[in-house]
Amino acid sequence: MKALVKKTDHELIQLFTDGNLEALEALVIRHKDKLYTSILFLVKDKYLAEDIFQDVFIRIIDTMRSGRYTEEGKFLPWAMRIAHNLCVDHFRKVKRTPTIRNSEDKDIFEVLNFTDDSAETVMMKRQSHHRVREMLERLPEDQREVIILRHYADMSFKEIAAATDCSINTALGRMRYGLINLRKLMVQKQIAL
């Protein structure tokens, strides 16, 4: 397994299609945090996020086994697009529009690992994250989605554009206006982060 960690996504996919199940496990481990975090922000329910996360990898496995995977070097954006589409499908089924929110029962910022900080530092970080989360909720959905995908899922603007089905310039514009609006909210609330 240690040898697989150093392989590229493309190499892992090739190994998996040749029958190496550990290669798939390495892919899951490599990308699970970004995928799960993005899904959780979209659906706001940790159990639903886990279900969708599993569905994403079921689709990935089916596609790779059938030989239809062709996006060399673009595994994560492709997987994020599948996750986004499955979230949209879920909301269509329940006749709701997709929203991006954090989970009430599991703080999404808990997914981000803190270093061995003191209890006071951890508490201050949690308070800051809570304030940012409250301000993110006040942003328009399209701006909130781009900020979340950029900062918490660590996606490039090209990947964000592919995942949200918009142009790179549109994603950049949403990010710009989202950050401007966040700054305005910080000034209004007199918050320094």
List each language-model region with its residue ranges.
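Sigma70-family region 2
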Residues: T17-D18, F57-K74
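Short, charged helix-capping/linker segments at alpha-helix termini
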Residues: A3, T17-E25, Y36-D55, I168, ...
